[in-house]
A protein has these predicted regions:
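Active-site phosphate-binding and catalytic loops of NTP-dependent enzymes
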Residues: 41-45, 84-92, 185-189
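GHKL/Bergerat-fold ATPase module in large chromosome/replication-associated machines
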Residues: 192-249
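ATP-binding catalytic core of ATPases
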Residues: 132-205
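Short beta-strand element(s) in the Bergerat
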Residues: 55-60, 152
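Acidic ATP/Mg2+-coordinating residue in the GHKL
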Residues: 64
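Bergerat-fold GHKL ATPase/HATPase_c domain
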Residues: 1-55, 72-78
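Flexible hinge/switch segments at interdomain interfaces of large molecular machines
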Residues: 2-14, 171, 211, 215-220
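Flexible ATP-lid and adjacent glycine-rich G1/G2 motifs of the Bergerat
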Residues: 67-132
Length: 249
C-alpha cells in the first residue's frame, strides 16, 4: 500500500491570499483589527504620495500605541496561517491570513517596540518575488529602545499598484465606520470597553488628520413624516430615519 501525504504549494498560497482580496481597503480593516488585538487606544492612518526616481509611489502609514511585537510577534505577522490570537476569544484575528494583503506592494517596513527592545523589519519587493515564485524574506534589526513605551508603526509602499482612487479621506472614513472594529455598534448595547479608543485619519486628499471616535455614527431621527413631505416632496423617503429597539431572548 502506498501513502500520499498532501502538500502545500507555499508560494501559491501566499499569492492567493495576498492578491485575492477584492477591496484594497481591506488592508485598513486588518490594520485596525491588529491594533485592537494589541490593546491600542490610539491609532493613526495616513496616505500620501512620494517621489522615487520620478515615479509617484503610494505610501500608507499605520501606527498604534499597542503592546508592540517581538520576534515571535513579527514572525506571526509575516507568516501565513500562524496567528497568536487563535486561542484568545477576545481577539479579532484568528486565521493568520488578513495581514497577507499587505504583500501586494513594493515594500513593507515595520518598526515596533516591546519590552525595551526596538525591532525594525523590512520586506523588499514581496509582490514581485511572489510572482517569481519566491517567498519574500524579512530582514530584522534589533536594538535597545530609547523609551520603554511600546508602539507599532508600519509603512507600506507601492500598495495596489500605486492606485490611489480608493484612499480619499471620505471614502476611507466611510469604510472604517461601516466595515471595521472602529465602527462597532457595541455602545448601543451598553458595552463601553472601547469607548476611549480614537483613530486619527488623513486621506490621500487631506493635509490634516481628523479624529474619529469609537463607535458607529447613527444619524439623528428625522422629523415627522408629514413635515418631511412638506420639505422634500417626493424625496422625503430619502431623509426618513427611525430607531427601533426590540427586546427578546
Amino acid at each position: 500500500m502506498e501513502t500520499i501525504r498532501p502538500k502545500v504549494n507555499e508560494t501559491q498560497e501566499f499569492i492567493e491570499i495576498a492578491f485575492d482580496f477584492s477591496n484594497p481597503l481591506d488592508l485598513i480593516r486588518e490594520a485596525i483589527s491588529n491594533s485592537f488585538d494589541a490593546k491600542a487606544t490610539e491609532m493613526k492612518i495616513s496616505f500620501k504620495t512620494i517621489s522615487d526616481c520620478g515615479e509617484k509611489i503610494l505610501k500608507i502609514t499605520l501606527e498604534d500605541n499597542g503592546v508592540g511585537m517581538d520576534m515571535k510577534g513579527l514572525q506571526s505577522f509575516f507568516d501565513l496561517g500562524n496567528s497568536m490570537s487563535r486561542d484568545d476569544e477576545e481577539k479579532i484575528g484568528e486565521k493568520g491570513h488578513g495581514t497577507k494583503v499587505y504583500l501586494n506592494c513594493k515594500c513593507i517596513e515595520v518598526e515596533t517596540v516591546k519590552d525595551g527592545k526596538k525591532y525594525k523589519a523590512v520586506m523588499d519587493e514581496p509582490k514581485r518575488k511572489l510572482h517569481n515564485r519566491e517567498i519574500p524574506t524579512v530582514e530584522v534589526k534589533i536594538e535597545e529602545a530609547d523609551s520603554k513605551k511600546s508602539y507599532t508603526k508600519i509603512e507600506v509602499l507601492g500598495y495596489n499598484n500605486n492606485r490611489r482612487d480608493k484612499f480619499t479621506h471620505d471614502n476611507v472614513k466611510d469604510y472604517i465606520l461601516w466595515f471595521s472594529k472602529m465602527g462597532s455598534i457595541e455602545k448601543e448595547f451598553g458595552i463601553y470597553k472601547n469607548r476611549d479608543v480614537v483613530l486619527y485619519l488623513k486621506g490621500i486628499d487631506k493635509d490634516e488628520y481628523e479624529k474619529i471616535e469609537f463607535g458607529h455614527v447613527f444619524p439623528q431621527e428625522s422629523i415627522a413624516v408629514s413635515k418631511l413631505f412638506d420639505t422634500y416632496v417626493v424625496d422625503a423617503p430619502k431623509y426618513y430615519c427611525k430607531k427601533f429597539i426590540k427586546n427578546g431572548v
